[in-house]
Amino acid sequence: VIELRNVPADDVDRMIDLAATVFHFRITDRDRMRDWVSRMERIGAYGIGGPGEDDLAGQMGVAAQRLSVPGGELDCSAVTFVGVLPTYRRRGILSSLIDRMHADAAAAGRPVAALWASEGPIYGRYGFGVADRRTGFKVDTSRPFGLRTVPDDRPLRLLDRERVPDVLGPMYARESARRPGGLARDEWWWLNRLVPHRDERSPEYGEPRVVVHPEGYAIYRTQGRTVRLYDMAAETPRVEAAFWTYLASIDLTHEIVAPERPVDDLVTRMAADPDQVTVTGDSAALWLRLVDVPAALRGRSWAADDTFVLDVADARIPGNRGRWRLTTGAAPGCERTGDAPDLALDVADLAAVYLGGTPVRTLVRVGTVDEHTPGAADRLDAALAVPLAPYTNDNF
């Protein structure tokens, strides 16, 4: 028998051990991990009445977050630390955990949930869709790195790590207001996830370095002749050019690696010699789930005035199923209707297009969205349009 219940504080170490078993990692800083897990809402699936009585068989962590969406922010359940012991697989534990998360999110008034997927096909079945992607670059700086964009010439300065939350916080908030997909960062997140003394994923890199400009910042580390860019926010292309110029000119280094950049990053277009910039990867980033479809659709701004009838399928949340009249524009609305649909789609595909990063027209071509009214996909794309591609750089 499996019983779901909240995981008490004295079981946090059991959650850490379960995660290490499932994700095959070595625990190098238990105290910091314990601090992180202690901050979450924790759901545990306990085996009751068998030979492993009171086993922690599966788990899920949820952080109460704010997600930047076009025109504002929405309360969001940030799902993490999900796992089921190999001895308890195929017993419906993950389904039970996700259903519980959906119910908790609805009760807390969070219309969306989000996660990073270690195995993407799993979460599509639960209504999650890829809402944004990341791309990676390598820049050859063994020779001068010229730019077509004139860099902003105001001075840059290095910032002490302890001042990062106060100085970078407002800059990041402005960046998130411009670009959907950002998650709120508190002081703990800045110091422990953005600029920890040691990068647990790449321990060969040195201490974090933070360079700031009145209108932006860049966080990087170095190792040998390599500069690794972790995060950058720039309010104008000229400020962005100033950071690339700075990173390319660091003495004794020959390359910049930037594995986690937005898909519309300007560096490939800024470079005077495009051959100095190599695209090294493209990967799914944030998976989004619309827990409350009408609240989510009313909760973002829209780029065009229009009206659509959407026929939404949802295998997990009955309240989302059916036909919705979506009115876009200055006063968005979403109400139930019996009218014929313009578009029919699964809630996972609605999540994929929600932040403006995936064209509806593309999903029509893929075959996962049905266009019943000719031109409806293009019209919805026009309403969903955002000036900057959605981007999430906080892997939780």
What kind of feature is each model-predicted range?
Residues 81-84, 89-106, 237-248:
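Conserved acetyl-CoA-binding loop-helix of GNAT-fold acetyltransferases
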